Amino acid sequence: MNPIIFIIILLTIMLGTIIVMISSHWLLVWIGFEMNMLAIIPIMMKNHNPRATEASTKYFLTQSTASMLLMMAVIINLMFSGQWTVMKLFNPMASMLMTMALAMKLGMAPFHFWVPEVTQGIPLSSGLILLTWQKLAPMSVLYQIFPSINLNLILTLSVLSILIGGWGGLNQTQLRKIMAYSSIAHMGWMTAVLPYNPTMTLLNLIIYIIMTSTMFTMFMANSTTTTLSLSHTWNKTPIMTVLILATLLSMGGLPPLSGFMPKWMIIQEMTKNNSIILPTFMAITALLNLYFYMRLTYSTTLTMFPSTNNMKMKWQFPLMKKMTFLPTMVVLSTMMLPLTPMLSVLE
């Protein structure tokens, strides 16, 4: 792809998200979502192969359906209130449709089926944009309309997402699919605390984006896409392999790493609001995610990974790609837990 065209497309994606985040008019929000969706499709199809085409088509169809639901919710709201203002939804039907549309855009269960398939079919760099930047716009709208969201609906969606994000990743060997299921589970954690403390949702989103960006950057540096190729990285880049494993465990929420902080704070916030059964269930279900991250870590630490094919050993070469921000990202992904007392201002 021509570098100038690529930069224009990236700027369009950024502009689309910014329009959604700063708009107070529903029509502008919808336009921002459409810009965002149409701009990322050429990036997904950077590699011309059937898998990328299929993934882009699936993404286009699901996002179009979500945009249609969003517009339907806006029109119903307009009929009852006569207003285009983003902040408040005056009708329960409009609120329900809007929540479902945003859940579909975020890839939350039960609208999650497109996320693993699309992530698996596109390059790692496109997967990084899809699982990080593309979450900002829908999450910002959810943050703005949270007072009028149906509590039971959003909690049902979040619990389903945490459960399916854990179960779905158990049987995977493809790292992109594992990251996709991890994304579904993280979206569940974010939306579970949204009705109680929306600022906590933003904190969780920031930490999730940092950890996912770090993981994808290291996968791209090593061209790692499967459990098998991950198990051979120790011979190629031993230091980076250790960092990958630490970040994986952080994503699983293992103390004393950064990923434990949002889970701890969310459970604390929900128990303060007299919700006991739900956080208990969420904490138990989080062990599913931790299990498949631990399994990846274990398989990588084996001296010889059990594989049927005769795979050549990787050789240590100096990395040609410049990794300027990687040390900072790894530190943020693994060592933020001591900052937790400073975040008491969120309450």
UniProtKB/Swiss-Prot annotation:
Organism lineage string: Eukaryota, Metazoa, Chordata, Craniata, Vertebrata
Keywords on record: Electron transport, Formylation, Membrane, Mitochondrion, Mitochondrion inner membrane, NAD, Respiratory chain, Translocase, Transmembrane, Transmembrane helix, Transport, Ubiquinone
Compartments, as annotated in UniProt: Mitochondrion inner membrane
Catalytic activity: a ubiquinone + NADH + 5 H(+)(in) = a ubiquinol + NAD(+) + 4 H(+)(out)
Name of the protein this chain belongs to: NADH-ubiquinone oxidoreductase chain 2
Class of this enzyme: translocase
Residues that span the membrane, as ranges: 3-23, 25-45, 67-87, 96-116, 122-142, 145-165, 178-198, 200-220, 239-259, 274-294, 325-345
PANTHER family xrefs: NADH-UBIQUINONE OXIDOREDUCTASE CHAIN 2 (PTHR46552:SF1)
GO cellular component: mitochondrial inner membrane; respiratory chain complex I
